[in-house]
UniProtKB/Swiss-Prot annotation:
This protein's UniProt keywords: Toxin-antitoxin system
Function: Antitoxin component of a type II toxin-antitoxin (TA) system. Partially neutralizes the RNase activity of cognate toxin VapC.
Species of origin: Rickettsia bellii (strain RML369-C)
Protein name (database record): Antitoxin VapB
């Protein structure tokens, strides 16, 4: 059951509230006037994948079909080309 906290108190105790949500799994309803206007609750679907299991996840996980994979690589290349820094141009700016 969520604890009701007035908005003013939530502002003053925000760090404590976040820590209680994160470490203790507590939930809070934030009240402004007579209305509940927000909720702060733990995220329920935390990732349970460990780094040591990433290889297995990538091997057995979902894959793109060949057309989508090709388009994805084209998109990545486009981003790389568009964000490349021209070193000579950069130096000219400092002259």
């Amino acid at each position: 059951m969520a604890q009701i906290v007035k908005a003013t108190e939530a502002v003053r105790s925000f760090s404590d509230i976040i820590n209680r949500v994160y470490y203790k799994g507590e939930s809070f309803d934030i009240q402004k006037g007579n209305n509940i206007v927000a909720q702060i609750t733990p995220v329920e679907n935390k990732s349970s994948v460990k780094v040591k299991n990433l290889d297995e996840l990538f091997k057995n996980g979902p894959h793109l079909d060949p057309e989508d994979a090709e388009q994805f690589m084209k998109d990545v290349d486009d981003v790389r080309r568009s964000t490349r820094i021209n070193i000579e141009e950069l130096y000219r700016k400092w002259d």
